[in-house]
Amino acid sequence: MSDRLLVLVRHGQSEWNLKNLFTGWKDPDITAQGVDEAKRAGKLLKAEGFVFDAAFVSELTRAKHTLSLILEELGQTSLPVKSDIALNERDYGDLSGLNKDDARKKWGEEQVHIWRRSYDVAPPGGESLKDTLARTLPYYVQEILPGVLRGERTIVTAHGNSLRALIMVLERLSPEAILKRELATGVPIIYRLRADATVESKTDLAG
């Protein structure tokens, strides 16, 4: 089994997930359920014997809080953590902070669906998934992947769309395929990589 370990975790449920709001770069914390999800992720990783050498996180509170709870469960609170805006959620621009139902009333269901689920169409003032990939992928290639290939066991805690961008590259998925991929909050996805950075194995640690 490969020692080139990469674990991806979407943050626990956020306050705005619960309220059905577009969040993007807005900065709500996680809910009580989100706290439970993060702690559960940490317990599952600990039960499987995971110990990490490197940790990466976005600049947003919901991801940072999730990672801190995971590391607490692992007894690794002293592990250095690198945070970067490159791992932030997709910026929803003018949709940020709006209730998703209200947005559908304002712009129409079809238009909002296009903004949410097309690869290269951005909402007003915001990013498409393609835009998100354009900032997330270089950071992965330059900052995260080299350590993984050296055998550093690495955890990345981020967001639905920034993680979709990484998964698209890791699993060599088409834009159509990645847009259909739903990522549960607080569920670790375990990748073991080959020396050429392709995926040897993948496991969802749902418990």
Curated annotation (Swiss-Prot):
Give the pathway annotation.
Answer: Carbohydrate degradation; glycolysis; pyruvate from D-glyceraldehyde 3-phosphate: step 3/5
Q: Does the keyword S-adenosyl-L-methionine belong to this entry?
A: no
Alphabetical GO biological process terms: gluconeogenesis; glycolytic process
A Pfam family hit: His_Phos_1
What keywords sit in the KW lines?
Gluconeogenesis, Glycolysis, Isomerase
Summarizing the function annotation, the protein's role is: Catalyzes the interconversion of 2-phosphoglycerate and 3-phosphoglycerate.
UniProt-recorded name of the protein: 2,3-bisphosphoglycerate-dependent phosphoglycerate mutase
